[in-house]
């Protein structure tokens, strides 16, 4: 800031501007946080009617506030964590984040199920005494993975019992098994005549909150049965 001063002891209507030479105060050099003496510098008298008694003071440099704001992150259930990054504001005097921060990393609350997990300051800190660090957290959001269920095509002969309605599963994560996250079974459109009958999701459902289920149907095809006709042997007299 401008180095200013107060004047006392003027006589006979004199003004400071008339008896002082207009020189400026100076201060001890330095830009880091600390206390720096304010010196008389070039300030002096132009009047022979006074002796100048200068009393110094201090310029105190206090810490600047360095703001670190964590970036919000997302990942799909079962995927690896993204890098936990942040934005920095409040740098002064050409300082860089790399020069004033210790390079420590942010951390997040542990957990791999779908949900929100707080991103915390972790080991991130300052190596510069010129700042106070204000950390603002954010969240890593784990979203649901897509579980694909594709019904197997089936056939049966007219009049036979239905085959088991089976399916293929893809998209499992984190060592999950279909048996641990799915309940219920498929069903098919009613009918026993020859034709094509859609295989539906039925009551097949998820019991895990970590997935969305995408079902793709198929068909049960009833084919014709073979009807055997065997003529009876016959005889007659000539």
Predicted regions and their residues:
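Solvent-exposed beta-strand/loop surfaces, strongest in extracytoplasmic domains of secreted
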Residues: 1-238
